Amino acid sequence: MANSSIVALLLLFVIASSVNGGDQEYPNQYLTEALGDKEWLVSVRRQIHENPELLFELHKTSALIRRELDELGVSYSYPVAKTGIVAQIGSGYPPVVALRADMDALPLQELVEWDHKSKIDGKMHACGHDSHTTMLLGAAKLLSKRKRMLNGTVRLLFQPAEEGGAGAFHMIKEGALGDSEAIFGMHVHTGLPTGELATISGPALASTSIFSVRMSGKSPASSETYSCVDPVLAASSTILALQLIISREVDPLLSHVLSVTFMKSGGSEFDVIPAYVEFGGTLRSLTTNGINWLIKRLKEVVEGQAEVQRCKADIDMHEDDHPMYPATVNDHKLHEFTEKVLKLLLGPEKVKPANKVMAGEDFAFYQQKIPGYYIGIGIRNEEIGSVRSVHSPYFFLDENVLPIGSATFAALAEMYLQEHQNQTKSGD
């Protein structure tokens, strides 16, 4: 469907549904205003896309966001977690709800040829975080216009380092959540057409961890193999033994993954057995307990095989540079609330059930502190080539999603405050 057709259909839906009034007032008004902001949203997103930055080094991205917040008259705290931003809109009093967007790009070379491709070699917004950031800025603009009508406070978290740096953990550590009672986030989804959203209650995304192992032996010439301690054989037998964990120790109805993704030796000579071999990979489970069990068994198998093979094994779980991400588990009450808001916003036919996915997401760190909900927002548009999966150098985003995401964020926040204002008063 062409871009103009999608926008036209959304406008028709807003006009047709506005006659119902009641709870639909907020969503309809937000969607109408967001569609009017589309040109600005596209401009912001393209500026971010052209200048991708990695992990915590988001200086240009952060400066752009702060400039836009200043223009909107929205107050904020900076820096949080090095280059993160926490903005605040509303009364300054409870109830408090948080909205989160990740900002960082990926170390990929963009291979899509278009006027606004990445200007930085080897860096690309291939996971849609530029759009998430833009949607949250769009929500800030929408909410700032209604700040005197907000029945509480909205905190907007612009977070660095989702891609492996556990930026959410560091944002929490530096007080980004404040008094927030709940948090919402979203991610673009190429499996859904633009204009549709996906929801799920309970486990949604996997707990993930990476590991690397160095097995050290004794390296004589290959003509004296009787005197060596061979790390090649030791590593090979260890890798095979690790595969038995999934096939022989885990219920096949449970979602566990253990993948060895690389192996390399400490030498390249044809006639010398290397002194060491390194290998590593990833662990995944739909529960945090599951990943902890996998880590425990990984260590037991590696250490046991090393002892059998007379090698020394050093295991690195990369807790400092790439800590384990908990499982993303959507709160059931927030699931019911979110589905209600999304159906008011776009219509029941646009809200689809999401599938569980074995990807990891550091949004889960927030969910360990307060109830949270993570939404998939569709961007599939075959006519313009918005079909490639995230983390592809050919990833291309349908920018029609930007006003939809902005309105979604804003509607969730205002309606959450509206519903929980009465609870806060009754608890006083």
UniProtKB/Swiss-Prot annotation:
Example GO BP: auxin metabolic process
Pfam families named in the record: Peptidase_M20
PANTHER family on file: IAA-AMINO ACID HYDROLASE ILR1-LIKE 3 (PTHR11014:SF140), PEPTIDASE M20 FAMILY MEMBER (PTHR11014)
Gene3D superfamilies xrefs: 3.30.70.360, Zn peptidases
Tissues and organs where the protein is expressed, per its UniProt entry: Expressed in cotyledons, leaves, and hypocotyls of seedlings, and in leaves and pollen of mature plants.
NCBIfam families: amidohydrolases (TIGR01891)
Stored CDD domains: M20_IAA_Hyd
Name of the protein in question: IAA-amino acid hydrolase ILR1-like 3
Binding annotation for Mn(2+) 2: C127, H129, H187
Keyword vocabulary terms for this entry: Hydrolase, Manganese, Metal-binding, Signal
Protein EC: 3.5.1.-
